[in-house]
Swiss-Prot record:
Gene3D superfamilies: Dihydrodipicolinate Reductase, domain 2, NAD(P)-binding Rossmann-like Domain
Protein family: Belongs to the DapB family.
Protein's UniProt name: 4-hydroxy-tetrahydrodipicolinate reductase
Origin species: Streptococcus thermophilus (strain ATCC BAA-250 / LMG 18311)
Functional pathway: Amino-acid biosynthesis; L-lysine biosynthesis via DAP pathway; (S)-tetrahydrodipicolinate from L-aspartate: step 4/4
Entry's Gene Ontology cellular component terms: cytosol
InterPro entries with a match to the protein in the record: DapB_C, DapB_N, DapB_N_CS, DHDPR_bac, NAD(P)-bd_dom_sf
Reactions that this protein is recorded to catalyse: (S)-2,3,4,5-tetrahydrodipicolinate + NAD(+) + H2O = (2S,4S)-4-hydroxy-2,3,4,5-tetrahydrodipicolinate + NADH + H(+); (S)-2,3,4,5-tetrahydrodipicolinate + NADP(+) + H2O = (2S,4S)-4-hydroxy-2,3,4,5-tetrahydrodipicolinate + NADPH + H(+)
Protein purpose: Catalyzes the conversion of 4-hydroxy-tetrahydrodipicolinate (HTPA) to tetrahydrodipicolinate.
Any one GO BP annotation for this protein: lysine biosynthetic process via diaminopimelate
Keywords: Amino-acid biosynthesis, Cytoplasm, Diaminopimelate biosynthesis, Lysine biosynthesis, NAD, NADP, Oxidoreductase
Active site: H145 (proton donor/acceptor), K149 (proton donor)
């Protein structure tokens, strides 16, 4: 039976790409579109909504969310409360918010996914970086995105850092008497290492994890050159969350 999908944020770049992915899969049905800036009432016969409250009682299985950090938490909570399994690519969630949504999903016995990155290569980078940090504990993360991205550092960088923290012995890097002559020059501090954010036009989504040791170095890098790179992960998420009864944070839990 076809999985009925709502796409929230369909006017955006990621949302519009997700719409095309859903339309191109015979196992999925595009049930509704949501965006507060939409002027049209329907697109190719699919109803368009500007207020999520109008979707209460709507017949759908999955809520795909590519909106903005300011509304993503409320959208995800709304989806769970109304029986839609959320697949969320919007970043900016706090640990407390993720825990609240996980608890709500358990109460409702509804599956869900919040993923900082849907590209399979990016997930592999996270795993490889965590493994490497056991042997190269001195490291820095550099993430690079388009200049319209609102949050920094990226959710992918934060998730990578969290996975590294789980296995790396905590240590403070750099000189003890290190001094920034320009505030922020060393980037954001996380568990003793640094995260740097680059925002430039022409970029999509890129990340490096640079490791240093005596006499050697190791660099891991992933590049998304086009948003289509995320769609295999979104597709997987849609098809997996309907089988589950709890929300998870990170696509790696579904691989």
């Amino acid at each position: 039976m076809s999985i009925k999908v709502i796409v929230a944020g369909f006017k955006g770049r990621m949302g519009s790409t997700a719409v095309e992915m859903v339309k191109g899969d015979d196992e999925l049905t595009l049930a509704a579109l949501l965006d507060p800036f939409a002027a049209e009432k329907e697109v190719d016969g699919v109803p368009v909504f500007t207020d999520k409250a109008d979707l209460v009682g709507f017949d759908a299985d999955v809520w795909v969310d590519f909106t903005i950090p300011a509304v993503a938490y409320e959208n995800t909570r709304f989806a769970l409360e109304n029986g839609f399994a959320p697949v969320v690519g919007t970043t900016g969630f706090t640990e407390a918010q993720i825990q609240k949504l996980t608890d709500l999903s358990k109460d409702k016995s509804i599956g869900g996914l919040i993923a900082p990155n849907f590209a399979i290569g990016a997930i592999l980078l996270m795993k490889f970086a965590a493994e490497a940090s056991k042997y190269f504990p001195d490291l820095e993360i550099i993430e690079l995105h388009h200049d319209k991205k609102k949050d920094a550092p990226s959710g992918t960088a934060v998730k990578t850092a969290e996975l590294i923290r789980e296995v790396r012995e905590s240590k403070r890097q750099g000189a003890e008497d290190e001094m920034e002559t320009l505030a922020g020059a060393r980037g954001a501090e996380f568990d003793g290492f640094r995260i740097h954010s680059v925002r430039l036009p022409g970029l999509v989504a890129h990340q490096e994890v640079i490791f240093g040791a005596q006499g050697e170095g190791l660099t891991l890098r992933h590049d998304s050159y086009d948003r289509i790179s995320f769609m295999s992960g979104v597709n997987l998420g849609i098809k997996e969350v309907v089988k589950r009864d709890q929300l998870v944070y990170g696509l790696e839990h579904l691989l």
